[in-house]
Structures are given as structure tokens and as C-alpha cells.
């Protein structure tokens, strides 16, 4: 692992409204990015219109089963102008689970002075008596089905945090978004990777300071972010497009967690923009997380699920799901990924050491990049700017920031 020059990505999301974004045609990057910041918001776009016409329910193509149950009828996949449905294996082969660095660059075009919704990131207190200087730094990564699974994966980073701060680091195994936010609010947790949708809760409730996201820094172009994929079984005859979720009886669709961006909040805002209203048009069942949603669809426990693309990619890579047995019927443009954060009361010297450990090292050749689909580089971000699309979604849903809304 080599030390590198710090890269700064203090960015700007375009000023388009959520409606403008979700209404973009999913086809080309050109107009989906345009003024709206491309990836960020157009989250409804990549597939917004393409899912409707390409997948539909496919009719029955001259047989008893509708065409969307036969992958040989699926359109050729073009990442710049995607049409659906598509096998998950096809999307993964094309690298469509992430966006490009150009998506992040588009977010940088119009920096914001303050968040559009909720409070600004808290400053470090002026009163030194309020600063935290613990012997051991408590660190937590966004909860998974097995919260301990990433402790050894992150060892190169944890070792560098110890080296740069002079503090020992304990990997805290927390099992929910609410537990993470509450632990930082009570200053029992000092460092955390908060999932995309939970970041504003952490900022507003726990005085978290998001400062960095992971990217794939290898190769010439690199990759950034993740997408919302709406998945169902290939052989599900009832669902071949987003519109097919409007069923009678209602389809049982898994949402990950109330505070999850791609697993709940974004679908509520963006699907409604396409005329499909969760809980009115289909039944919502909270699975507890993206892994659980993915496995639940694969095991026929749910009819469909909106999931984080990189999350299901990890489940597939671990051979828990056959990607040729699931299809994606709708996809978003890229969202920002997990935001790595520290509590604002952490001693300034420790804050700077933490930032060095994340931003001044190249982790591309480590277990971190291996586990996280090549994302072995951390870059600096500005919360108000890069999270603007997420805040647009949460504003449109009138989200209230309290830990009760983080409970499953």
C-alpha cells in the first residue's frame, strides 16, 4: 500500500428539481446528467422510460409465458442508453452496478453553501473542554447481516488510522442504522461509514461530519457510486416492468429499511414519479437490509425488491445468488455511496489523523479493493453538495430526522 497525494473532490450537484430528474429519459447520459447532476438525481432515469417500453410485461410473444420470462428476448444492453429487462449477469458483466467518475464530476459543477434540507454539518466546538480524546477510537461500518464480516477486510485502513492518530481502533459490530446513529449521538461511536440514506440522519441527529466516499481509483476512468436496481425472478410471469408492480392482488415487494436510500426512500419518491406508489399500488415488506431483500427475492419470499446494486453484486460474488435467475426491470442513475464520517467533537488532531488515513493512502491493492468491487480509494466530499440529490428525495418525502424513523 503506497501513500498518495490527497485528492479533493468538493463537489456540486446540479440544481434541477426532483421532478425534473425523475422525469429524465433514462437513455442517454447526455440529458439525464444535464443540469440535474446526472447520476445523482436522475436516479429515476436510467430506466425511467426504457423499462416501460422494452420490458413491459412483454405480452406473451406467441406462447403461454410472457416474453420477459425469456432472456433470449431481452434487448442488447447499452450502458449509455439502457433498456430493460436485463439479467443481473448482463448488468454485472457491463459494470453497470456503478457509475463513472464523470458522474461525480457532474455533481461538482455547482457547489452548495449549505444543505437544501436539514441542518448543516456541525463545526468542531470552540470550547476545548468539549473535545473528545479517547484512548480507543470506536469505528463502525454500515450494518450488514453479519456486522463482523468486514473487520479483517478493513484491517489496512484500521491500521493506518492507528498509525496516523496514535490511538487504538476497535471495530464496533452494530446491527442497525439506528444503533449506529444513536451510538455517535451519545459519543460512544467516533468513526463510522453510514449508508447513503442514513447519512442525513447522522448529520442531523448525531453531529456526524461526512468527509469521504470510496471510489474505484484503478484504471483510466475509475468508477463511482451505486444504482437502485428493481429486481424480480426471471420466471416471474407477472412482473416485467416497473408498471407491473401495480397488481391485483397487490405484489409483495421487499424494501430494505425505512431510512435506506435505494431500498426505500428513493423508490418511494422515484417510483411515484413514474406512476407507481408504494403501499398504494403494492405491499411493502421491510426485509431488514439489501442482502435480505436480495436473498428473499432469489428464494421467492418476495415478488420483487429495490436493492443497492453494489450490495447485491457482493451477494452474487459470494455465490449466494445465481445472477442468471434474476432480472432487473428498472434502474437508476448513480447515487453516492457510504459516507465515512467522524463525530464533530473529536479532537481536531485526531480528526486530521483520521482524514490522512483515509485520503493519503492508496488501498487499491488491498483486501479493501478486493471486497468492495475495486473501490480502494477514498476521496474528499462536501456533504451539502454531493448529498444534494439524496436531500431532494428526503425533502420530497418530508422526512423527519429522528432515530425512531431509523428502526426497522
Name each model-derived stretch.
Residues 1-175, 190, 200-201, 205, ...:
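Terminal disorder- and signal-encoded targeting elements
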Residues 174-185, 199:
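Acidic helix-start/capping segments at beta-turn-to-alpha-helix junctions
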